[in-house]
Amino acid sequence: MKFSALLSQCGLRLILISVVSLMGFLVGPSFAHAQTAPSENESDTGIQVDKPSKLRNLVPAEQLERAADKQFNQMKREAAQKNALARDDHPELIRLRTIAQRLMPHAARWNPASSRWAWEVQLFGSNAINAFCMPGGKIGFYLGILEKLKLTDNEVAMIMGHEMAHALREHSRERLAKNQLTGIGAGLLSSILGLGDLGRTVMDYGAQLTMLKFSRDDESEADLIGLDIAARGGFDPRAGVTLWRKMSSASNKTPPQWLSTHPSGTDRI
């Protein structure tokens, strides 16, 4: 074997090792949760959570909030065109906003920046059992989750607190940053190995499974912080048990827990 060929092969091995090491370092638990420490406000909450990953700084918060605001407005426009956006006098929307008003004052202890957010609550006329809170405090509930589960105010507060916690802890921002890094690493590794599109697809699947662990951790953290926010708003945290029992009963067909981004209802109980 010629020296140049040997050198080239060694170089490829070195690059390959570097890429694999870099991906493991950047998206692995050892870095993402390198500093397992109390939140800045543990003295106020008594709840210990991991410090947010520094990777989130790769995605500017302001840019993400602007994108979320744009997406939320688009959702409202599309829903309004289908007559599926609740009017301000809709009883369920009034109920949601009343509950939100009791929770919002307790958000800043988990993210001081939320004090400047333009919080907004909307109700969409969909049968889906779902709710969300986008970065920047854009809260959306689907009518299906209220009607199909027959939620009490306490149970609504549990869901709303949970979704608010995702935004407050910047889970979307962190996951986007990690997805960008795994995408870059997967593409580079596939090119080095000469696997082409097939290799990229396989690597992407692996990247998704890597991300699921973080997502499941995010869900558990949101459960804990959501309970804190709801309880401080004067709602009964025991409603979390009845809520997840309802969720479990409503989920007739769910993916295996290991491949799910949400822990099962029974695990949450």
Segments (PLM) and residue ranges:
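A Zn2+-metalloprotease active-site environment signal
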Residues: 2-269
